[in-house]
Amino acid sequence: SAAATPAEAVDGAELVITSLFGPDTVREVVIEPGLIPEGVSWADATTVSPTDAAAFAEAVPGYVHTPVVGSLPPAREGKLGVYVGGADASRRRTVSTVVAPWAAANPSRLKEVDTAAGAATGKLLANLALAVTIEGFKEALLLGQSQGLSEEQVVDMLGSTGLEFIVNMKKSFLLGERSVAPGDFTADAIAKDARLMLASAETDLPAVAAALASLEAQQEAGRGDEDFSTVVVNR
């Protein structure tokens, strides 16, 4: 049954699992009110920066970062990737056992990392790959279109290239076989993550910056709550 408040939800728990929209929400809901009882393990799947993850680990000794790679369809089938990061090996192993069903279809996709910040970095790397390849897919379509190729022809020509993964993931949206609303992984969500990447890097990330510009154009057009394939569909 649903609890009336977060405090009621965690009362008596041995392990608390959260998945929220970004680090600011984690601070508001969990850190500032001191939500996690002393001695209780806290597995948080929210996408945050490495700096945020390190701060949460310092604030809550039971913190284990458990970001996931994948969207709703693979989640329903136990096909997510999961990074489990924390300095306490015992807590990390316990949490790994609990979240193992998230990656049940491919257990090798569950990876333990010895710090929460390391797990956060892994998640940003995974989403960086999505951001820059959707930008590459968009630019490939623009190049092909400028030379008279159809969308179908560009999709076919991108087979067996470095963009094949993102093309196979998103071509059904591009070719009208699926609607971009509701989104599996929204433009708002990946734009948020791209900003975390840029803030976390100690150097310029021009490909990420280009991807973010495309995502922000979709947000400005009112399509932030659509699947991030809107970048190619509404290019």
Enumerate the predicted regions with their spans.
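Amphipathic alpha-helical hairpins
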Residues: 15, 21, 25, 51, ...
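Short, amphipathic C-terminal "tail helix"
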Residues: 229-235
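A general structural motif at alpha-helix termini
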Residues: 13, 60, 158-161, 215, ...
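Proline-centered loop/turn at the N-terminus of a beta-strand
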Residues: 41, 62, 81, 204-206
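Helical "substrate-binding/catalytic lid" subdomain
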Residues: 118-208, 212-229
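Rossmann-fold NAD(P) dinucleotide-binding segment
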Residues: 2-64
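Rossmann-fold dinucleotide-binding core
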Residues: 31, 48-127
